Amino acid sequence: MMSPTPEDDRDLVVVRGRLRMMDSGTETDREQRHPRTTWRSICCGCTIGMVFTIFVLVAAVLLGSLFTVSYMAMESGTCPDEWIGLGYSCMRVAGKNATDLEALDTCARHNSKLIDFANAKVLVEAIAPFGVPNAAYGEVFRLRDSKTTCIRPTMGGPVSADCPVTCTVICQRPRPLSTMSSIIRDARVYLHLERRDYYEVYASVLSNAMSK
């Protein structure tokens, strides 16, 4: 004889799963870790914000310098060996007993040009106070400005003289830029804000102004 089945048993649903017991200590640890995580997130956000702000400021300064800063006002670099630095130019005696064409070719090999009158005047006046004997002033050197008029250095300063067939060659070129000035100049040239030969022309103008 079968036992009767209660009506409530037919409505039962089988439920399978795991029962996990959690003590109150776990909830306490989770509450303690939450403020630490929040504080770390705030610190990380502040650090990223500071780094981004510094980057933006540096970029703004560099971009502003491309348009406003005159790199000619910065400290210039040093002249190469065997070159004399004077003002915004570097000069050197590149040869002797050279004709006009030989003088031009000699300076071209040194990536330079013949000295002009303004720089020749500054050079002679700079070495005159050292009391070099007149014998050292016997050389006549050519000028870029004229093919017929040369310069003869004297204790009293430069004196114009007729150019002989051959004479001394003195070359000049702009003084090298410092590292920072070179970066600014290259950036301006790359952005087509300035011509590549602008510095050479500007240095020549400043040298002429200094000699007056």
Swiss-Prot record:
Looking up InterPro entries in the UniProt record yields: CTDL_fold (IPR016187)
Q: Which residues are glycosylated?
A: N97
How does the protein's chain sit in the membrane according to the entry? Single-pass type II membrane protein
Kindly state one GO CC term assigned in the UniProt record. Answer: virion membrane
Its subcellular locations are: Virion membrane
Query: Does the keyword NADP feature in the UniProt annotation?
Result: no
Has the keyword Transmembrane been applied to this entry? yes
Q: Which family does it belong to?
A: Belongs to the herpesviridae HHV-1 UL45 family.
Q: What is this protein called?
A: Envelope protein UL45 homolog
Tell me which species this is from: Meleagrid herpesvirus 1 (strain H2)
